[in-house]
C-alpha cells in the first residue's frame, strides 16, 4: 500500500477510533474538527486519496459509509448501523404542530435499537424537560407505540393535534402530561394520543 502523509494517517486513525468506540464512522465535520481542518472539501479530498491508496472504501449513496481496508480491516456492515429518520421538531415547551416530514437520517448502532423500523428521532425545542436531562436542541430517540405506562416519557398528540414531549400519567378521569421543569404546570387532557416512548437522548457537545 502507498505510504500516507501525516494528515492522512491522522484522519485514518481517527476514523478507526470512532468506529471502535461507537460502531459507526465519524462525519466529515467531526473529522475536520479532530485534525484541524475547517474546510469540508479539504477533508473530502483526503478521504478520496485514502480511498485511491486502498485504505478505505466509501459508499456515496449512504451517509458516513466508510469501510476500513488493509491489515487493520474494520467492517461496518449494513446490519451494524441503522439510519434512523429525524422527522422534524417537536416541542418540549409550548406544544407546536407536529412535523412528520423526514429532515435527515442519523446513524445509530443497531445493537442498541430493537425493532429499528419502528424508531425515529425528534429535535427538542424548549426547556420543559430539563430536569429529566432533556435540553433544548437535543435529539430524542423514540420507539413508535400507542400506549404508555404511568411515568414514562412520551411523544404525545394533544386534543388540538399538536405534539409534545412530556411524562405520561393516566388518572381517574383525565390524562396528565407532566413537564420535568418545576416552574411549569402540567397539561391536563380528556383525550391524548401517544405517538411513541422516548428511549434515548443524543446531544452534540461541540
UniProtKB/Swiss-Prot annotation:
Protein name from the UniProt record: LexA repressor
Gene Ontology process terms (BP): DNA repair; DNA replication; negative regulation of DNA-templated transcription; proteolysis; SOS response
Active site residues per record: 128 (for autocatalytic cleavage activity), 166 (for autocatalytic cleavage activity)
InterPro entries assigned: ArsR-like_HTH, LexA, LexA-like, LexA/Signal_pep-like_sf, LexA_DNA-bd_dom, LexA_repressor, Peptidase_S24_LexA, Peptidase_S24_S26A/B/C
Site residues (Cleavage), renumbered to this chain: 92-93
Source organism (scientific name): Bacillus cytotoxicus (strain DSM 22905 / CIP 110041 / 391-98 / NVH 391-98)
Keyword DNA repair: yes
Residue intervals passing through the bilayer: none
Amino acid at each position: 500500500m502507498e505510504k500516507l502523509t501525516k494528515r492522512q494517517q491522522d484522519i485514518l486513525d481517527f476514523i478507526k477510533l470512532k468506529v471502535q468506540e461507537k460502531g459507526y464512522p465519524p462525519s466529515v465535520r467531526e473529522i475536520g474538527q479532530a485534525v484541524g481542518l475547517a474546510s469540508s472539501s479539504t477533508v473530502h479530498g483526503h478521504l478520496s486519496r485514502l480511498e485511491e491508496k486502498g485504505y478505505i472504501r466509501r459508499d456515496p449513496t449512504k451517509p458516513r459509509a466508510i469501510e476500513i481496508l488493509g491489515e487493520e480491516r474494520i467492517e461496518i456492515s449494513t446490519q451494524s448501523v441503522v439510519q434512523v429518520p429525524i422527522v422534524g421538531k417537536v416541542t418540549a415547551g409550548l406544544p407546536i404542530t407536529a412535523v412528520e416530514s423526514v429532515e435527515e437520517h442519523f446513524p445509530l448502532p443497531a445493537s442498541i435499537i430493537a425493532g429499528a423500523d419502528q424508531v425515529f428521532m425528534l429535535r427538542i425545542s424548549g426547556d420543559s424537560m430539563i430536569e429529566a436531562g432533556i435540553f433544548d436542541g437535543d435529539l430524542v430517540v423514540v420507539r413508535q407505540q400507542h400506549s404508555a405506562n404511568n411515568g414514562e416519557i412520551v411523544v404525545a398528540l394533544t386534543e388540538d393535534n399538536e405534539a409534545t414531549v412530556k411524562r405520561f400519567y393516566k388518572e381517574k378521569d383525565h390524562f396528565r402530561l407532566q413537564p420535568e421543569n418545576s416552574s411549569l404546570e402540567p397539561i391536563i387532557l380528556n383525550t391524548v394520543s401517544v405517538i411513541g416512548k422516548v428511549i434515548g437522548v443524543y446531544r452534540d457537545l461541540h
